[in-house]
């Protein structure tokens, strides 16, 4: 049977759309709770690969909470059930025939199945569907922080026990709920609204799915001490692009771990070269020695240096002063700004 469909709404950030057809008496699929899905559980992928209609393949859940870099909000179910071109939008169901996900993408070097497929979890898809049906668009919650993975090196720098999982706050946006409630750079978020947070993707998705106006409690670690902050979630701005000093011409590369990083004070020429904003003041990386520890750690030409070992370095002189007083044989913590985002990196001796 064929029906004419009307597009109710789309959400490009999750690759989910809702269509409406005029029909009655059609069977419907039951929704499963994807949060209860476990690695190793059997699943079936339904779709039309290569135009072969009503094809079903069997596999298992290979992993949960995957981020594949193909959508802005990702919490993919990874499966080895054969997913090929034409499966996108098809159902991923459990052995009871309940919907656990929507097939979205494959990882392939040949264009065909290689045993790695991804599906949007049913809980995320259901939340998106409800908003598209009710409002024709998706309204996402907003905390207003830049976050990154808490690596073992960063855990050590911020005094977080190795067995504690969390998400590191690298920056706070102006006029955001986080700013108004007292978040600080270097905070490590361990729990959001009663749920433990173990990755940036996990926290990003949790905040986005929070109802605007809801009060939530965020538990974090600051300066090695636990802390709780209560705040009200705001609506995510439409444009989330992260919301002039005189130059002496001097370029420096101090000794020690910073010896392989050459910096200069920002001027109009450097700002234009590296795409910095007129409001960006401080020192910018103009060279990183190839094959050095700094390059291996992720320092790049054009990075704006905001802090060294949590001390602000807004000028060449302040950078030199901090660099000259770094303790020997100890890791150095850098706070950099790259393409509008603040990130922490660790240089190890």
Predicted regions and their residues:
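Exposed loop/turn and edge beta-strand positions of beta-sandwich/beta-sheet ligand-binding modules
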Residues: 1, 25, 55, 73, ...
């Amino acid at each position: 049977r064929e029906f004419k469909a009307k597009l109710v709404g789309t959400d490009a950030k999750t690759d989910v759309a809702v269509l409406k057809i005029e029909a009655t008496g059609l069977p419907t699929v039951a929704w499963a709770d994807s949060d209860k899905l476990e690695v190793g559980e059997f699943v079936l992928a339904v779709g039309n690969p290569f135009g072969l209609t009503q094809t079903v393949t069997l596999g298992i859940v290979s992993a949960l909470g995957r981020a594949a870099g193909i959508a802005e909000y990702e919490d993919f179910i990874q499966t080895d059930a054969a997913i090929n071109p034409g499966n996108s939008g098809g159902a991923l169901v459990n052995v009871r025939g309940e919907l656990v996900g929507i097939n979205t993408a494959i990882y392939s070097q040949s264009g065909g199945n290689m045993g790695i497929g991804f599906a949007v979890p049913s809980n995320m898809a259901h939340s998106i569907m409800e908003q598209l049906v009710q409002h024709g668009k998706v309204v996402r919650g907003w905390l207003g922080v830049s976050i990154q993975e808490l690596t073992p090196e960063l855990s050590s720098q911020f005094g977080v026990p190795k067995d504690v999982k969390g998400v590191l706050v690298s920056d706070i946006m102006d006029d955001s709920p986080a700013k108004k409630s007292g978040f600080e750079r270097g905070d490590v978020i361990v729990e959001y609204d009663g749920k433990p947070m173990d990755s940036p993707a996990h926290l990003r998705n949790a905040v986005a799915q929070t109802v605007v106006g809801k009060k939530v409690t965020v538990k974090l670690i600051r300066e090695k001490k636990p802390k709780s902050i209560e705040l009200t979630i705001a609506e995510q701005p439409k444009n989330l692009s992260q919301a002039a000093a005189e130059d002496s011409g001097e370029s420096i590369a101090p000794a020690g771990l910073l010896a392989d990083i050459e910096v200069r004070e920002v001027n109009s020429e450097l700002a234009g070269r590296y795409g910095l904003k007129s409001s960006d003041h401080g020192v910018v990386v103009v060279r990183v020695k190839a094959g050095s520890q700094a390059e291996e750690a992720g320092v790049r030409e054009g990075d704006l240096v905001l802090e060294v070992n949590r001390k602000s370095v807004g000028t060449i002189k302040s950078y030199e002063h901090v660099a000259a007083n770094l303790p020997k044989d100890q890791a150095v913590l850098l706070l950099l700004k790259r393409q509008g985002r603040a990130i922490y990196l660790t240089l190890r001796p």
